[in-house]
């Protein structure tokens, strides 16, 4: 159950945070954003979808998309839990999660990601362990 890429995008599709763990997929945040925006306001994009063999799992907050891409056909709930735990730890360290706070604290966020996910394999999920 490995993660190929993790990215945080603004609602406009700008890449704020991008980490390629396994280098087995070309940069896929553009593919993700085009497919999420394919849905209309009345329709909601599913939290998991597949494009050309790449699985995208994401959570949308008010202004941000936090997404994982993987080639594994593992449980989507597992990947959603990884995203939830990552968001929780980031919020514990920087407070409110907005595009501005991410840009101001991007070095810290990359350090958190590197502590929690090692070569695409989630390791730590508790704020106390990551500190």
What is the role of each PLM region?
Residues 1-131:
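Acidic, low-complexity cytosolic segments
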């Amino acid at each position: 159950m490995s993660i190929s890429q993790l990215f945080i995008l603004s609602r406009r599709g700008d890449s704020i945070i991008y980490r390629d763990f396994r280098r087995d997929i070309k940069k896929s945040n553009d593919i993700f954003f085009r497919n999420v925006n394919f849905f209309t306001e009345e329709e909601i994009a599913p939290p998991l979808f597949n494009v050309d063999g790449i699985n995208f799992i994401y959570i949308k907050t008010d202004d941000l998309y936090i997404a994982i891409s993987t080639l594994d056909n593992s449980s989507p709930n597992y990947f959603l839990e990884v995203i939830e735990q990552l968001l929780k730890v980031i919020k514990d360290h920087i407070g409110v999660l907005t595009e501005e706070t991410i840009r101001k604290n991007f070095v810290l966020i990359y350090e958190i990601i590197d502590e929690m996910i090692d070569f695409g394999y989630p390791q730590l999920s508790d704020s106390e362990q990551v500190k």
